[in-house]
Amino acid sequence: MASRFPKFSQGLAQDPTTRRIWFGIATAHDFESHDDITEERLYQKIFASHFGQLAIIFLWTSGNLFHVAWQGNFEAWVRDPLHVRPIAHAIWDLHFGQPAVEAFTRGGAPGPVNIAHSGVYQWWYTIGLRTNEDLYTGALFLLFLSAISLIAGRFHLQPKWKPSVSWFKNAESRLDHHLSGLFGVSSLAWTGHLVHVAIPESRGEHVRWDNFLDVLPYPRGLGPLFTGQWNLYAQNPDSSSHLFGTSQGAGTAILTLLGGFHPQTQSLWLTDIAHHHLAIAFVFFIAGHMYRTNFGIGHSIKDILEAHIPPGGLLGRGHKGLYNTINNSLHFQLGLALASLGVITSLVAQHMYSLPAYAFIAQDFTTQAALYTHHQYIAGFIMTGAFAHGAIFFIRDYNPEQNRDNVLARMLEHKEAIISHLSWASLFLGFHTLGLYVHNDVMLAFGTPEKQILIEPIFAQWIQSAHGKALYGFDVLLSSTNSPAFNAGQSIWLPGWLNAINDNSNSLFLTIGPGDFLVHHAIALGLHTTTLILVKGALDARGSKLMPDKKDFGYSFPCDGPGRGGTCDISAWDAFYLAVFWMLNTIGWVTFYWHWKHITLWQGNVAQFNESSTYLMGWLRDYLWLNSSQLINGYNPFGMNSLSVWAWMFLFGHLVWATGFMFLISWRGYWQELIETLAWAHERTPLANSVRWRDKPVALSIVQARLVGLAHFSVGYIFTYAAFLIASTSGKFG
């Protein structure tokens, strides 16, 4: 008999119902639960899958380069980055009528195309690419790397080349290699690329493999490095009249500390960026020698942790036992990695618009909005994943004996205090913020807007002033002309910083007022509530007041009736599930705030945000309704334009989102009735009844139905906002 799916679980493969398919898909990546899994095979499978992941990433980025080179207008865009719309790829659609063909034929293309809002044109331009040939070369190189990654993954699954468990658990060596090799070497290599290729290209000097060894990136070469005159590398930077991509106004410096932005491109100075990467490389080369390996230098992480015993004894046995706990738990390590990556991704979103690194990207408003929103959503999903794996760690990997009275055990022991404090913070933020908004709504509704409660964010304004923003008149630190830091800033370091922070044409330290104060606290409410749900889910994963015996029930047990006090909504999975809704709504508020504030800034009517953002009707009317009006006008052959597809996607996104609720408000008996009815109808329908299946149809489990609902809610939510964001921004600014 042919083996049935799933091969990794004999128990499931023999299941006579459709549960076999769904549970097979659900546990396909849960290697730990597979038949015949050993610790060694687990580590090797994950290691090999990393190469597969790299192959997919390289293939995807190669595809971006290839399609732009083939169907884009990169060379035309390079000649006039501010007025030519960058093309992502061509559209070939049988459904397009003549009005659609005309509406989507843009950017000098011969037929319908999609416009790129990803910033890849600006990125490739900044790093020195100039022709389609450059793009094709990059695509082929990445395709080669993709193939190498696939071969490497297959190679490391061969018996002779499988690494041992001890190799995977050698934390010090891995850290040293990742710090020095991954971060250090790649940062140094990137500095090299910027200095040898990107900076000369920005000054009109074309450097490629044929002349790479002949063109000195700095007139005196490595002389200043060996003679200790490093300051020479910063002398004669590009002038404020420099035209990017030409020699007009160009200097010779390669490593600078100018601060602020290039006046023409509105992006960070390339020579500052090169300097930054060189500094990072230096720091990481040192960091990569921090942990002791075979060479006898550096520290043992275990020794460091075991030495961490607080003198007063207030933290019990301190960090004893933590090294083995972390080193033997893949879920703990994944949780730490996801938490770090989530924070970094959110910081990337904040810095991409406030300190744009790519030439001319700051003037491409739709791209700025799309990139900010994209990175915040990615960060949200990654961070919720961190807590999910933290919860799985407590269920599968946590050993109370090994961690007796250390910081981890003590955190579990006072989890009630942690959870209740988070709860109080959330309640305080929620009631007070909503109270202020609602009060202001009532005052406007009753015709007394002067009675609004408007609170100036004075602490945040003081922090902005300390960084040099002079508008508020605080006269503190960098905004005080008497401060030594202010005077040094004019001459020694970052002379361009103070000009940039006080220039109203960029997004650096935006002016804030009462509307910002309110939405800041609304976002704080969302963050604290999301954190509360996630932290509670992880800390209660092994057992809670209601159900002290969760360990053997696993991560995602379903509702189980009133026995043991009822198990509804108390598995760690239930907490993750609820937290994702809060995460999405919180990021909704974050992106609404960012987008509305920037639209008014770009249009030159900041008063609209300042006046309308202090009450809820202002948000609904002047942000959501006003900016979606183009998307709810409908579409027809006469009014067809390039926003019509976004109008359709806006509708479609709402539909997917609403479908999610059908799966969320239900219980298992409902699904079983539904599937029985569908199966009955199918078997009695001509033609359809000639198709039979071997598996008996059974209902979705409660957890599965919730997952289907959550997936539709998330996808629909993001589709809806993506259409709104891109259409409302590109509709205004082209």
From Swiss-Prot:
Tell me which residues bind [4Fe-4S] cluster: C559, C568
Cofactor note, please?
P700 is a chlorophyll a/chlorophyll a' dimer, A0 is one or more chlorophyll a, A1 is one or both phylloquinones and FX is a shared 4Fe-4S iron-sulfur center.
Membrane topology annotation: Multi-pass membrane protein
As its record notes, the protein acts as a catalyst of:
reduced [plastocyanin] + hnu + oxidized [2Fe-2S]-[ferredoxin] = oxidized [plastocyanin] + reduced [2Fe-2S]-[ferredoxin]
Q: Which domain of life does this protein belong to?
A: Eukaryota
InterPro entries membership: PSI_PsaA/B, PSI_PsaA/B_CS, PSI_PsaA/B_sf, PSI_PsaB
Q: What is this protein called?
A: Photosystem I P700 chlorophyll a apoprotein A2
Q: Which organism is it from?
A: Cycas taitungensis
